[in-house]
């Protein structure tokens, strides 16, 4: 049995710069990983079967991104003659990241499966090839595949590696799940934030265009942010529902965590520019 990190991410900022004819929104965002997340346990099989041993409530196994990623890699590697005969896997997950939380849990799971099975099956696909596969599963999957903090543009697929400060974060989940379409379909969502260079953006105060909508539509998010803002700069990650506050030291973050209200599910983690998944491969 092998064990593989599936880390969370934060959007340190997120700006919506437009909307394409196909309905997808264009954006500029800054991804950084956390040293916290799910863990995937993978045991290779020799009969070509993919088994997910820990089903997710409300999600059929064949619809789960873990299974979809495994089957996609199997298909592409087989078609290109790079899949050893009988390659399969038993996969289980220790789930720590909430669904609909804006921490990238499902995308991270898919990326970990692609990277881990490519290694375990010895398929030999490059990171570029894996990232291309990942994009067909979700816009956030490539950044997890590539494994480095990044400035993202387009619909999130154009990635430029960056090295923002690795701060400590208190991340709080207010107990609601926010489906991404709920935010992106809101008529009041800002959709015309001017594009700026990464150098300019890094010098500005960070914010998230989705935050005003999430706070308006979900009182739990509004309450969580109102509480966090009493202690430190805080904002929404992704389309929510998780919010985070940044600190210079772990001790400062933990002092605030000790005061968290009971209705908040919160944890402290360090921002890291190299994904824990890729540290595992070094």
Swiss-Prot record:
<dbReference type="GO" id="GO:0050515">
    <property type="term" value="F:4-(cytidine 5'-diphospho)-2-C-methyl-D-erythritol kinase activity"/>
</dbReference>
<keyword id="KW-0808">Transferase</keyword>
<keyword id="KW-0414">Isoprene biosynthesis</keyword>
<feature type="active site">
    <location>
        <position position="9"/>
    </location>
</feature>
<dbReference type="GO" id="GO:0016114">
    <property type="term" value="P:terpenoid biosynthetic process"/>
</dbReference>
<dbReference type="Pfam" id="PF00288">
    <property type="entry name" value="GHMP_kinases_N"/>
</dbReference>
<comment type="subunit">
    <text>Homodimer.</text>
</comment>
<dbReference type="GO" id="GO:0019288">
    <property type="term" value="P:isopentenyl diphosphate biosynthetic process, methylerythritol 4-phosphate pathway"/>
</dbReference>
<keyword id="KW-0418">Kinase</keyword>
<comment type="similarity">
    <text>Belongs to the GHMP kinase family. IspE subfamily.</text>
</comment>
<dbReference type="InterPro" id="IPR013750">
    <property type="entry name" value="GHMP_kinase_C_dom"/>
</dbReference>
<dbReference type="GO" id="GO:0005524">
    <property type="term" value="F:ATP binding"/>
</dbReference>
<dbReference type="InterPro" id="IPR006204">
    <property type="entry name" value="GHMP_kinase_N_dom"/>
</dbReference>
<dbReference type="InterPro" id="IPR014721">
    <property type="entry name" value="Ribsml_uS5_D2-typ_fold_subgr"/>
</dbReference>
<keyword id="KW-0067">ATP-binding</keyword>
<dbReference type="Pfam" id="PF08544">
    <property type="entry name" value="GHMP_kinases_C"/>
</dbReference>
<protein>
    <recommendedName>
        <fullName>4-diphosphocytidyl-2-C-methyl-D-erythritol kinase</fullName>
        <ecNumber>2.7.1.148</ecNumber>
    </recommendedName>
</protein>
<dbReference type="InterPro" id="IPR004424">
    <property type="entry name" value="IspE"/>
</dbReference>
<keyword id="KW-0547">Nucleotide-binding</keyword>
<feature type="binding site">
    <location>
        <begin position="98"/>
        <end position="108"/>
    </location>
    <ligand>
        <name>ATP</name>
    </ligand>
</feature>
<comment type="function">
    <text>Catalyzes the phosphorylation of the position 2 hydroxy group of 4-diphosphocytidyl-2C-methyl-D-erythritol.</text>
</comment>
<dbReference type="InterPro" id="IPR036554">
    <property type="entry name" value="GHMP_kinase_C_sf"/>
</dbReference>
<dbReference type="InterPro" id="IPR020568">
    <property type="entry name" value="Ribosomal_Su5_D2-typ_SF"/>
</dbReference>
<comment type="pathway">
    <text>Isoprenoid biosynthesis; isopentenyl diphosphate biosynthesis via DXP pathway; isopentenyl diphosphate from 1-deoxy-D-xylulose 5-phosphate: step 3/6.</text>
</comment>
<feature type="active site">
    <location>
        <position position="140"/>
    </location>
</feature>
């Amino acid at each position: 049995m092998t064990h593989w990190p599936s880390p969370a991410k934060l959007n340190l900022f997120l700006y919506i710069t437009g909307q394409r004819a196909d309905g997808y929104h264009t954006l500029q965002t800054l991804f950084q990983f956390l040293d916290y997340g799910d863990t995937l346990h993978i045991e290779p099989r020799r009969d070509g079967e993919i088994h997910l041993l820990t089903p997710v409530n409300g999600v059929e196994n064949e619809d789960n991104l873990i299974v979809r990623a495994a089957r996609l890699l199997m298909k592409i590697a087989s078609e290109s003659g790079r899949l050893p005969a009988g390659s399969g896997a038993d996969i289980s997950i220790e789930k720590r990241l909430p669904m609909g939380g804006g921490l990238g849990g499902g995308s991270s799971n898919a990326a970990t499966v692609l990277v881990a099975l490519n290694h375990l099956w010895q398929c030999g696909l490059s990171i570029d090839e894996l990232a291309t596969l990942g994009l067909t599963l979700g816009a956030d999957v490539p950044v997890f595949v590539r494994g480095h903090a990044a400035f993202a543009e387009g619909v999130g697929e154009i990635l430029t590696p960056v090295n923002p400060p690795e701060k400590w974060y208190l991340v709080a989940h207010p107990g609601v799940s926010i489906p991404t379409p709920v935010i992106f379909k809101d008529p009041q969502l800002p959709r015309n934030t001017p594009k700026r260079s990464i150098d300019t953006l890094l010098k500005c105060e960070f914010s998230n265009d989705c935050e005003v909508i999430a706070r308006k539509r979900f009182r739990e998010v509004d309450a969580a942010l109102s509480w966090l803002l009493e202690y430190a700069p805080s904002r929404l990650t992704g389309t929510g529902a998780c919010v985070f506050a940044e600190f210079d030291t772990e001790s400062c973050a933990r002092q605030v965590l000790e005061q968290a209200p009971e209705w908040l599910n919160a944890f402290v983690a360090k921002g890291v520019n190299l994904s824990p998944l890729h540290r595992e491969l070094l």
